[in-house]
């Protein structure tokens, strides 16, 4: 509750409708828990990356989440990967971004059958130029039959949305209030008084 979350659904080609739908599912759940949520685009419009970053930086954002799918020429490429701001060469990284990337990666893998492609530090503009902790999540490969089939179902998209919600909640929970990965449910958060 009382957190400002910016959701950035990717808008490139085939991923556009899928990640927008996932973002709307996340938005609804976050609103029900009392968070303030901003989607950076509607179903048909797509602001530029610099516009999304500027919007995020002017809205007291607590967390910036960029949602995407991936493709590859090799149809065997599959799985979920998360990215946070960091550069091993320069010895810098976003501590909160890295923690959230790890949490959402764990929750998605615990709740779905997506291959764990792990979390990675990157210096992409959307991660580097936002003032808030920022994470990009590639929720599977549309070029892979298995991932594409999963991403096409409402049940799978609901599982992804719940993974995001629980990861966000874990990010802000005290360690002693946390539960084993894959076991916490939205109803648990409500009964614990997380919702205002």
What is each residue range found by the language model?
Residues 2-4, 13-196:
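Active-site-proximal helix/loop segments of hydrolytic enzymes
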């Amino acid at each position: 509750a009382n957190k400002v979350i910016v959701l950035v659904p990717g808008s490139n080609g085939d991923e556009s409708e899928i990640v927008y739908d996932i973002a709307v599912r996340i938005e609804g759940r976050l609103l029900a828990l009392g968070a303030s949520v901003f989607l950076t685009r509607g179903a048909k419009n797509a602001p530029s990356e610099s516009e999304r970053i500027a919007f995020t930086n002017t809205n007291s954002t607590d967390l910036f989440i960029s949602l995407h799918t991936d493709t590859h020429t090799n149809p065997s490429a599959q799985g979920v990967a998360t990215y946070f701001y960091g550069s091993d060469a320069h010895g810098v990284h976003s501590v909160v971004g890295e923690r959230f990337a790890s949490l959402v990666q764990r929750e998605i893998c615990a709740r779905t059958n997506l291959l764990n492609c792990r979390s990675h530090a990157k210096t992409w503009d959307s991660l580097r130029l936002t003032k808030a902790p920022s994470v990009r999540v590639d929720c599977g490969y549309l070029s892979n039959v298995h991932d594409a089939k999963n991403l096409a179902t409402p049940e799978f998209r609901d599982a992804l949305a719940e993974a995001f919600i629980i990861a966000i909640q874990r990010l802000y929970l005290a360690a002693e209030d946390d539960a084993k990965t894959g076991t916490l449910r939205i109803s648990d958060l409500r009964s614990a008084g997380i919702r205002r």
